[in-house]
């Protein structure tokens, strides 16, 4: 059975690319002495997978990483130990057993909140409503 981490990627960490982030997690598990499952084959490596990779330069408070916990490390100890081994800007919030397949998370509905330092612009609401009312065309390629 797979396990999941809920983590945030903010500050300077938002400039870490997806592949570098995967390697960062693999190394952090080793530094934190948390045993995880490895891939099978001629060159086994720690198995980690990020549900929906972010583009470089974007930050997030709710990223999901899938891995396989081995040994007797309790779920409640993983966030603290792993955060201590991560670079600045990456914080592990929660570790838990996976309930659904990772591919199912790609079809989740998201709610986005935008904060404006000078209040919400008056023209924003009608513009957003017009955008949401547009019909979406599909192109076959």
Describe the residue ranges of each PLM region:
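Short, conserved charged micro-motifs
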Residues: 73-81, 117-130
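Short, charge-patterned binding micro-sites
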Residues: 38-69, 99-101
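Ordered, amphipathic secondary-structure segments that act as subunit-interaction surfaces
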Residues: 61-113
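Active-site-flanking beta-strand signature of metal-NTP-handling nucleotidyl enzymes
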Residues: 2-8, 110-114
């Amino acid at each position: 059975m797979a396990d999941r981490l809920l983590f945030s990627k903010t500050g300077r960490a938002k400039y870490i690319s997806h592949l570098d982030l995967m390697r960062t997690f693999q190394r952090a598990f080793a530094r934190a002495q948390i045993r995880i499952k490895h891939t099978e084959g001629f060159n086994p490596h720690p198995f980690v997978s990020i549900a929906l990779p972010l583009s470089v330069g974007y930050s997030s408070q709710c990223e999901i990483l899938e891995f396989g916990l081995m040994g007797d490390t309790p779920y409640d100890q993983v966030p603290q130990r792993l955060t201590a081994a991560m670079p600045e800007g990456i914080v592990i919030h929660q570790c838990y057993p996976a309930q659904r397949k990772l591919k199912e998370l790609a079809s989740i509905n998201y709610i986005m909140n935008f904060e404006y330092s000078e209040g919400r612009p008056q023209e924003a609401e009608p513009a957003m409503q017009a955008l949401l009312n547009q019909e979406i065309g599909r192109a076959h390629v």
